[in-house]
Amino acid sequence: LRIVQAFIAAGVPKQAFASLPSSHAGAEEILRRCGRGMVFGDTGSTAKWLTDSRIEVHGPGYSKVVLGPDASANFEKHIDTIVASIAENSGRSCVNASGVWVTSHAKEISRAIAERLAQIVPRLEDDPLAQLAPFANTRAAEYFSGAVDGGLAEGGAEDVTATVRPGKRLVVFEGSTYLLPTVVRCDSPAHALANREFLFPFASVVEVKPEELPEILGPSLAVALITDDEELKTRFLTRSSAHRLNLGAIPTPHIGWDQPHEGNLFEHLYSRRAIQFQKAS
């Protein structure tokens, strides 16, 4: 809707636009019939469009905060940045961090994050302290929570938030369903939960060797690299696949509107052409 309003503000007639709320099946039918389209979602909903040149695919993000050796050793100074990366916008954006990759102190870091995130609880929607968004579809919340539990059941991972707060992850408040923030510490970057994202504040904490960075991260939309190690920064600048790289204590959701990390909408909707004009007479 913001894109539509921007077009209208630029002078395009309102009659040129339509808002068509629909199911997933309805959305797919719209994409099949349109000349150009954009789709946002997880791998399940976007994979089928990857080879269709008409459709611009966005998602999943797998965004991450990475602490270099110096920052991992002094992690207490960076908890605010990590928490903001995970929890802003109720953790529902593709630029929210779903992973915190560190080079040491994974156990201590995961607990510090969990203790902070455990303070985020459901509140009334007009409460200025409200940070969690409810789920309109209870089944979706149940599915996401079940996916986390399924990954934990495989072993090699611990739900750290479960050790610092009472009760379950899925709760009902004032008739609405919520998923409470969850931090999982994985023993290996190969664990099923090490590179997952969900529509609530969720993050896995993974410890790796400094020399494995950045290649071991895998695809990442946004990465906040916190370190004063210039050699590590250079490796990320030259070898990272991240679309947005924040160097320093900059939360992953903080973006510069003059630096679109996924291109410009104009490039998808229009063909670029240079035209010069002069009257013949």
Label each region the model flagged.
Residues 29-30, 48-52, 235-236:
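A short acidic, amphipathic alpha-helical/loop segment
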